[in-house]
């Protein structure tokens, strides 16, 4: 029986390299691997449905799924795991603690970006800074 041909888009991570270099095989599948940046991969997946299997932004996936407009099915594999506490950068002449962000303008590339969801949760849960306390600006 011929192997199932599937396109697989993923980032170049230590956690995916064994698939890409062939060390780990997928039984019954002849994959065509594409190493792409997350931005390109997510855009092409959601806009053009370019891949059979791909890494996706969890929050963008949930937005699409909730709207009944997602062609993908999620599986519980998280390729990028990081604490997002160090992912916020502020002007050192104005912000001394997270609570100082209340009422400030904050630039974000996308509201639903998974890292931004984490950051808002950290600010709310750990520091009492609710999303409505911030002025989020699309950059």
Residue ranges with predicted function:
Residues 9-41:
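Short, polar/charged alpha-helical segment
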Residues 82-88:
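Small-molecule pocket liners
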Residues 124-134:
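A short alpha->loop->secondary-structure connector
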Residues 45-47, 101, 123:
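Hydrophobic residues within well-ordered alpha-helices
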Residues 38-71, 94-96:
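Pocket-flanking alpha-helical
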Residues 27-29, 63-77, 124:
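Ligand-binding "clamshell"
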Residues 90-106:
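Flexible hinge/capping segments at coil-to-helix
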Residues 137-139:
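Conserved small/polar residues in nucleotide/adenosyl-binding loops
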